[in-house]
Swiss-Prot record:
Species classification: Archaea, Methanobacteriati, Methanobacteriota, Stenosarchaea group, Methanomicrobia
Cofactor: pyridoxal 5'-phosphate
Originating species: Methanoculleus marisnigri (strain ATCC 35101 / DSM 1498 / JR1)
An example Gene Ontology biological process: L-histidine biosynthetic process
Enzyme Commission number(s) from the entry: 2.6.1.9
Family classification: Belongs to the class-II pyridoxal-phosphate-dependent aminotransferase family. Histidinol-phosphate aminotransferase subfamily.
Keyword Iron tagged: no
The protein, known as: Histidinol-phosphate aminotransferase
Cited Gene3D superfamilies: Aspartate Aminotransferase, domain 1, Type I PLP-dependent aspartate aminotransferase-like (Major domain)
Catalyses which reaction(s): L-histidinol phosphate + 2-oxoglutarate = 3-(imidazol-4-yl)-2-oxopropyl phosphate + L-glutamate
């Protein structure tokens, strides 16, 4: 019966997940493991988010608001008067945008190395992917990217980029928008940890979508809330393509509560920036400057897989970057965790 499965799924391994912390703890005899592999927020969600979620649980016998109106209003209070669409995590938003604009056989452009889901989702929808390698310093080759976008329906840029951590300068994004005919999806999953603000570009360009998530700085990864700034023309078509009731009532309520707690956001940002600085100063390998809640480290002469295994034996779970096309075999990605997790990592990496 395997013949019934679509070729795009039989010919690829799919999305690569980090090893489970419980498995590492059991394998190496630790009571707890430093979980630094998945770019999560180690702090619990805002009390306001938890309270709102608890209230929403009382009415889960009812279907959620398909228009996500309350969440959209909360987003406007937080960001200003933009148009928003929502989805089940950033992945859900990405997939819906692809489904909205890309026909099978049409071209999508991706700047690599980067988040692998763009290519996975493209393959699922029958799109042809053109990968544009980044420069040696992992900056975007703007000219090559624009050239690749000629005739393409959709392009993806991740800024700050996963896994390299660097941001694309707004002027480079603007040059790309000016030079391409299709739609640019700017993945801003980690932008809350950076100083760069791309939102003003939404006022000037009709071919820009900015994707965001509640999983990172807002600490709601388990509730899967994604959203995007979209131009007016795209919104009704996105809604037609979207999965019905993609966001549940509890997720939407929690997201609204988290958006209202701006002090929690500031505290989390400060925590991440302080530990990013310490990682840059104290890790005895090359650490790439990052605008995200993680850093990428070149662990040469070790491979990324070797470093992950050695750190796991010391009770630290990090991500090997060997699965990122175009990156090479000597990199790991380490997110900022709780203080004790970061301290354990620093002790472990110094004795790799």
């Amino acid at each position: 019966m395997r013949r019934l499965v679509r070729a795009c799924y039989t010919g690829t391994g799919g999305y690569s997940y980090a090893k489970k912390a419980d498995d590492v703890a059991r394998e190496h005899g630790f009571d707890r493991v430093a979980r630094l592999a998945s770019n999560e927020n180690p702090r619990p969600p805002s009390p306001a988010a938890l309270e709102a979620a608890t209230v929403a649980l009382r009415e889960v016998n009812r279907y959620p608001d398909e228009r996500t109106s309350v969440l959209v209003e909360a987003l406007r209070r937080y960001h200003g008067d933009y148009r928003f669409v929502t989805g089940s995590g950033m992945d859900g938003v990405i997939e819906t945008v692809i489904r909205t604009v890309v026909e099978p056989g049409e071209t999508m452009v991706v700047s690599t190395p980067t988040f692998s889901f763009y290519g996975i989702a493209a393959a699922a929808h029958g799109a042809r992917v053109v990968n544009v390698p980044r420069r040696e310093d992992f900056s975007v080759d703007t000219g090559a990217f624009i050239d690749a976008c000629h005739g393409a329906k959709l392009a993806f840029l991740c800024s700050p980029n996963n896994p390299t951590g660097n941001s694309v300068p707004p002027e480079d994004v603007e040059a790309i928008l000016e030079g391409m005919d299709g739609l640019l999806f700017l993945d801003n999953a980690y932008v809350d940890f950076a100083d760069t603000d791309y939102r003003p570009l939404m006022r000037r360009y009709e071919n820009l979508v900015i994707g965001r998530t509640m999983s990172k700085i807002f600490a709601l990864a388990g509730l899967r809330v994604g959203y995007a700034f979209v131009p007016e023309w795209l919104e009704p078509f996105y809604q037609r393509a979207a999965t019905p009731f993609a966001l549940n009532s509890v997720s939407m309520a929690a997201a609204g509560g988290a958006l209202a707690d701006t002090e929690r956001v500031r505290e989390t940002r400060d925590h991440v920036r302080e530990w990013r600085r310490r990682f840059l100063e104290e890790v005895p390998f090359r650490v790439y400057p990052s605008d995200a809640n993680f850093v990428m480290i070149d662990v040469d002469p070790h491979t990324g897989d070797e470093a992950v295994a050695r750190l796991a034996a010391k009770g630290v779970l990090v991500r090997s970057c060997t699965s990122f096309p175009g990156l090479g075999n000597h990199y790991i990605r380490v997110c900022i965790g709780e203080d004790w997790e970061n301290i354990r990592f620093l002790e472990a990496i110094k004795n790799l």
